[in-house]
A protein has these predicted regions:
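Extracytoplasmic beta-sandwich strand-turn segments characteristic of Greek-key/jelly-roll folds
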Residues: 2-3, 96
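Conserved alpha-helix/loop element of class I SAM-dependent methyltransferases that forms part
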Residues: 3-27
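Positively charged
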Residues: 162-166
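Conserved histidine-centered catalytic loops in small-molecule metabolism enzymes
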Residues: 146-160
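Conserved nucleotide-cofactor-binding alpha/beta core module
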Residues: 21-134, 138-144
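Residue-level detector of conserved, well-ordered beta-strand and adjacent loop positions
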Residues: 2, 138, 151
Length: 166
């Protein structure tokens, strides 16, 4: 099976990164590495003091992203992992920020659990195709979450235990 990378587009990457309120030194989880482009933009914004962990389900895309990130000089600031991103990456949790680049039917509980108090999660939520909305989840210091809609979007589905079936 051949996999095609359908990126969120530069405009959507910028919207998502702005909504993340990235800070120098943040520890960030990206779900859905794709080509590695979005992880590179996040790594650039959080600087060498921060780190991006990106998890991708498709082994071929892990290979593509790794190659692109190495070529662009980000391999020391971005760690790529192959696995079910809908479950997050608990090995390095908690995260200051989490960004999901595929639409989930609901906000996955494992991602909220891996978000540090005071953290922000950006995720497209909705149907396998449409409608979908970009959601900003803010976790307060007591672990309560506040959900804000950032508007309608169109993303590929998040495949996994907490996402959609293949």
């Amino acid at each position: 099976m051949r996999h095609t990378v359908i990126g969120a587009g530069r405009y959507m990457v910028a919207i998502m990164n702005e909504a993340l309120e990235l800070r120098i030194g943040n520890k960030v989880l990206e779900v859905g590495a794709g080509s590695g482009y979005h992880a590179a933009t996040v790594a650039e914004q959080i600087g060498p003091q921060g780190h991006v962990y990106t998890i991708e389900l498709v082994p071929e895309l892990v290979k593509l992203a790794r190659s692109n990130l190495e070529e662009a000089g980000y391999s020391d600031r971005v760690t790529l992992v192959q696995g079910d991103g809908s479950l997050g990456y608990p090995d390095r949790a908690p995260y200051d920020r989490i960004v999901v680049t595929a639409a989930a039917p609901k906000i996955p509980h494992p991602l909220v659990a891996q978000l540090r108090p005071g953290g922000i999660l950006i995720i497209p939520v909705g149907g396998r195709l449409f409608p979908q909305e970009l959601v900003k989840v803010r976790k307060d210091e007591k672990g309560r979450i506040e959900r804000t809609s950032l508007g309608g979007v169109a993303f590929v589905p998040l495949i996994g235990k907490e996402g959609f079936d293949l």
